[in-house]
C-alpha cells in the first residue's frame, strides 16, 4: 500500500522503542520536520529523549505524542513479529500501531501537506514529542512543559494523538481527564503470637472498620463533564507468611480517579479525618500523578469536531473517561487540550492493530485542524 502515512507508521514500528528507549523514532520525525522548515530543540532528561519543534509565530497549535511503547508480551502469540509491521485485511499490525505511532505518522504527514499548501501560515505550528509516557513519565512531557513555562513559551492549543476512538476514528475525543491520586498507607500495630493476642495489636483488625467505611464513601456525584470520583484499593499486604504470627503492620495502597468537583487536598483531608476517627496509628505517603483538567467548548474543540464531521460524517462524543495522559501536564500551560487518535480496542494487547484507512483519515483530520487554527 503506497501511502505516506502508512509508510511512516511502518518505519516507526520497526524501531523497537520500549519505554523510555526512543530507538531512533524521533530522529526519523525530526528529519521530516526540518525538511519543511521546523526549528528543532532537543530536550533530553536522564534516559529520556524529548524534542520541541516549531514553525512560524503567533497563536500556537502543538501536536503532542510519545514514541515509546509497552513490551510486546509473548511474541509467539503474535500473528507476525511485533516490530515487523504487516497489513492483513486492511489492518496494520505491530506494537505501537494504535498507541501511538500511527498518530505520530499522521501528524507529520499532515504538517507536510499543510506547509506545502500554506507556506506562510499565520500562526505557529509545534510538536512536543517524548519517549517516556508509557513508563514512569517523569523525564518526558512534564519536564519539557516545565522548561517551556520557565521561559514563558506560548501554547494556545494542543492536540494529543492518544488513541481516543472506540469503534471508528473520531467517534470519541477526550476534552479532559480525571485526576489521579495514590495513597500508600501503613497501619502500625504490635507483632505477636496468635495464641497471646492480648500481648499484641493486630493492625488488620484495627483497620477493618475503617476500610469498611472507606469503600462505602460517596466522594462526589461528578458533574456534566466528569463521572463521580472513584476510589479503588489496589494492594493490601500484611503478615509474615506464618499462621502463628500476628502482623505488626498492614500496608494498603488505594487510588482515586477524581473529578473537578474535588481537589487532591480535599481528598487527603477526608482520608486523614477518617483515619483519626478510627484512632489508628499510621504513616501515609501520597503521590499525585495528575490534576483533573477540562477543555470547554472553544476554538480547539470546535475545530476538532468540524474536522471529524467533515471527513467521517459523525458527531463525536466529548468524554473525560479513561486513564491519565500527558495532556495533564500540557494543560498547566493554560492551553486548550484535546485528544484525538485511532481506535483503542487493541492497545497494549497481543496483535495490536489499527485500520490502515483510519490513519489516512486521521492525517486529513489533523490537517484540517491546522487549517482552522494556524493557517
UniProtKB/Swiss-Prot annotation:
Catalysed reaction, written as an equation: N-succinyl-(2S,6S)-2,6-diaminopimelate + H2O = (2S,6S)-2,6-diaminopimelate + succinate
Binding-site list for Zn(2+) 2: 99, 134, 348
Keyword set includes Protease: no
Cofactor: Zn(2+); Co(2+)
Keyword Zinc: yes
Keywords attached to this entry: Amino-acid biosynthesis, Cobalt, Diaminopimelate biosynthesis, Hydrolase, Lysine biosynthesis, Metal-binding, Zinc
Pfam families registered for this protein in UniProt: M20_dimer (PF07687), Peptidase_M20 (PF01546)
EC category: hydrolase
GO molecular function: acetylornithine deacetylase activity; cobalt ion binding; succinyl-diaminopimelate desuccinylase activity; zinc ion binding
Binding site for Zn(2+) 1: 66, 99, 162
UniProt EC number: 3.5.1.18
Pathway info: Amino-acid biosynthesis; L-lysine biosynthesis via DAP pathway; LL-2,6-diaminopimelate from (S)-tetrahydrodipicolinate (succinylase route): step 3/3
One annotated GO biological process: diaminopimelate biosynthetic process
Domain of life according to the entry: Bacteria
SUPFAM superfamilies according to UniProt: Bacterial exopeptidase dimerisation domain (SSF55031), Zn-dependent exopeptidases (SSF53187)
Cofactor binding mode and count: Binds 2 Zn(2+) or Co(2+) ions per subunit.
Active site positions: 68, 133
Summary of subunit composition and partner proteins: Homodimer.
Function: Catalyzes the hydrolysis of N-succinyl-L,L-diaminopimelic acid (SDAP), forming succinate and LL-2,6-diaminopimelate (DAP), an intermediate involved in the bacterial biosynthesis of lysine and meso-diaminopimelic acid, an essential component of bacterial cell walls.
Family: Belongs to the peptidase M20A family. DapE subfamily.
Protein name per the record: Succinyl-diaminopimelate desuccinylase
Gene: dapE
Amino acid at each position: 500500500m503506497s501511502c505516506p502515512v502508512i509508510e511512516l507508521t511502518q518505519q516507526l514500528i520497526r524501531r523497537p522503542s520500549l519505554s523510555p528507549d526512543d530507538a531512533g523514532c524521533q530522529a526519523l520525525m525530526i528529519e521530516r520536520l526540518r525538511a519543511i522548515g521546523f526549528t528543532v530543540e532537543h530536550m533530553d532528561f536522564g534516559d529520556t529523549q524529548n524534542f520541541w519543534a516549531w514553525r512560524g509565530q503567533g497563536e500556537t497549535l502543538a501536536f503532542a505524542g510519545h514514541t515509546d511503547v509497552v513490551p510486546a508480551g509473548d511474541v509467539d502469540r503474535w500473528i507476525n513479529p511485533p516490530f515487523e509491521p504487516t497489513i492483513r485485511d486492511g489492518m496494520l499490525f505491530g506494537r505501537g500501531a494504535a498507541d501511538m505511532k500511527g498518530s505520530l505518522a499522521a501528524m507529520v504527514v499532515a504538517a507536510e501537506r499543510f506547509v506545502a499548501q500554506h507556506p506562510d501560515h499565520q500562526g505557529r505550528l509545534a510538536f512536543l514529542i517524548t519517549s517516556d509516557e508509557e513508563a514512569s513519565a517523569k523525564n518526558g512531557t512534564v519536564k519539557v512543559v516545565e522548561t517551556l513555562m520557565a521561559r514563558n513559551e506560548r501554547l494556545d492549543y494542543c492536540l494529543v494523538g492518544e488513541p481516543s476512538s472506540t469503534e471508528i476514528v473520531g467517534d470519541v475525543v477526550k476534552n479532559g481527564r480525571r485526576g489521579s491520586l495514590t495513597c500508600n498507607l501503613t497501619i502500625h500495630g504490635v507483632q505477636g503470637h496468635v495464641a497471646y493476642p492480648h500481648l499484641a495489636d493486630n493492625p488488620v483488625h484495627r483497620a477493618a472498620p475503617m476500610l469498611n467505611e472507606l469503600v462505602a464513601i460517596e466522594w462526589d456525584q461528578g458533574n456534566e463533564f466528569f463521572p463521580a470520583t472513584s476510589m479503588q484499593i489496589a494492594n493490601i499486604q500484611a503478615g509474615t507468611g506464618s499462621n502463628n504470627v500476628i502482623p505488626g503492620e498492614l500496608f494498603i495502597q488505594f487510588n482515586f480517579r477524581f473529578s473537578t468537583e474535588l481537589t487532591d487536598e480535599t481528598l487527603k483531608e477526608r482520608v486523614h479525618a477518617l483515619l483519626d476517627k478510627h484512632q489508628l496509628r499510621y504513616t501515609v505517603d501520597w503521590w499525585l500523578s495528575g490534576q483533573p483538567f477540562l477543555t470547554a467548548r472553544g476554538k480547539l474543540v470546535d475545530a476538532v469536531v468540524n474536522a471529524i464531521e467533515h471527513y467521517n460524517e459523525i458527531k463525536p462524543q466529548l468524554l473525560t473517561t479513561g486513564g491519565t495522559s500527558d495532556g495533564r501536564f500540557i494543560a498547566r500551560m493554560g492551553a486548550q487540550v484535546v485528544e484525538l487518535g485511532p481506535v483503542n480496542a487493541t492497545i497494549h494487547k497481543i496483535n495490536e492493530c489499527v485500520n490502515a484507512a483510519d490513519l489516512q483519515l486521521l492525517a486529513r483530520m489533523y490537517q484540517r485542524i491546522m487549517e482552522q487554527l494556524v493557517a
